[in-house]
């Protein structure tokens, strides 16, 4: 994409980006190229990772995050290309539709990082889920409303729902895999529209801060209701940390979305210092939730057969081990879908599933328990997997089991290896993230005109136009309105 943009900018002699003799490189092509290079560079690192540690069936290994990040964040570079190459004149219906689709694609791209939770068998702290939802909504919807004007957040949301819904139907209906659930972002979009209607978007920092607060409260409450209504599972509403990390992520991401809207006309852009602090807060929030520990918990697991399934009874030692759990239940997967069952307390430390779960065939079934940063599991049934030398864990009428780190069961393909491939993998991810972030900031700055000459000559103000003092009192245009002079798209 970066090469194609450079080719046409050169052929058209477009007044964009960097000029090297007769070659014109759009500013937006630079992060697009960096994203592609980072994603492609992750493939040999991923092969090395697998050779050193075995297969890692998770979205969130460092090499997989480089792949997903390169593709998902390319949607941001695509929007920057539309801004840089926008035609002069007022945008047509088609042009605004393309921009709305691009901004909806940003929400899709950022939601890719939630894929670890989309299929209902996550390996990380479940509190990440509302944090990622708040961050994606804060960044994409705040940017969309600033770029598209009134109803911009709703337009981007509609584009997102069309794309995500279509993909989910293909995965489930055509490919016959587990239906991937996804957040709706409806409450968040309504919040952003309401804030913009109330405060306007001219003061981008104020608009972003208030929108972020609304997303982290009303928006996440809406997602809690959606998750509950759809039977997806439970968000960790009983985890006190949610009142700190979700607002931190939502507000920080909203400020970053407001900062990226710098090329769009505003009375006051987000200060660079505020954007930098927001980036540090968001990164710190995501990194703070990475640790996964194991508590001293044991269980007696009893099965009551129901056909080829079973009701699972779990007796915990100590009895109060799940009294403050952020997630606790039984989940089955890999047998042709996903089955989850709640564990209802029937006595001190004794729990029974609310439905039978599979314990035969290709299914894998385990009891999951999370308590803040403790992410644990105990096996119920796992078939043998001779390809990776993993023995069967049969479905016994009664089993004594100690809870272990959940990846011990979820990633039975993994094995120990040397440290240096891990250093390369995590180092590559950190380098890519820093370079990509810096390039996005650079391009947004250049396209704003703060560090570059205007892309096209500014039109002469008509004689009947209001004088500067009066003009400064008029409301600033709240949407993407390029300079006049060339035909519209």
Where are these regions (language model features)?
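Internal/C-terminal transmembrane anchor helices
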Residues: 267-292, 489
